[in-house]
């Protein structure tokens, strides 16, 4: 059984026990989180498609870790002008462990 959830305009395919990496959520480690925007559910041979979401399905998860991604470098460059600008960025993330899919 798996489901596709919608979180801040991004879709994630989840199963029970899977750890997904989301953008930063301002909650403490160990807190329970409930996702209510489920757009697809597949159970055994049956599939349920939301129009736009499934109202009676939700997913329970547990905040397991906060962190920052690996640093990426952004470089702007203009040829023959002695212009070069570098910048770095590290995105914050939250790991969520999926406990159960309730339907």
From Swiss-Prot:
SUPFAM superfamilies: L21p-like. This is Large ribosomal subunit protein bL21. GO terms for molecular function: rRNA binding; structural constituent of ribosome. One of its GO terms (cellular component) is ribosome. Belongs to the bacterial ribosomal protein bL21 family. Keywords: Ribonucleoprotein, Ribosomal protein, RNA-binding, rRNA-binding. One of its GO terms (biological process) is translation. This protein binds to 23S rRNA in the presence of protein L20. InterPro entries: bL21-like, bL21-like_sf, Ribosomal_bL21, Ribosomal_bL21_CS. Part of the 50S ribosomal subunit. Contacts protein L20.
């Amino acid at each position: 059984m798996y489901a596709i959830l919608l979180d801040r305009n991004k879709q994630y395919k989840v199963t029970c026990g899977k750890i997904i990496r989301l953008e930063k959520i301002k909650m403490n480690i160990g807190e329970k989180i409930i996702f209510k925007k489920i757009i697809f559910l597949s159970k055994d041979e049956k599939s349920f498609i939301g129009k736009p979401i499934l109202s009676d399905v939700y997913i329970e998860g547990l905040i397991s870790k906060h962190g920052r991604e690996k640093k990426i470098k952004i470089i702007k460059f203009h040829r023959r002008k002695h212009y070069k600008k570098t910048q770095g960025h590290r995105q914050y993330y939250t790991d969520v462990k999926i406990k159960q899919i309730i339907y």
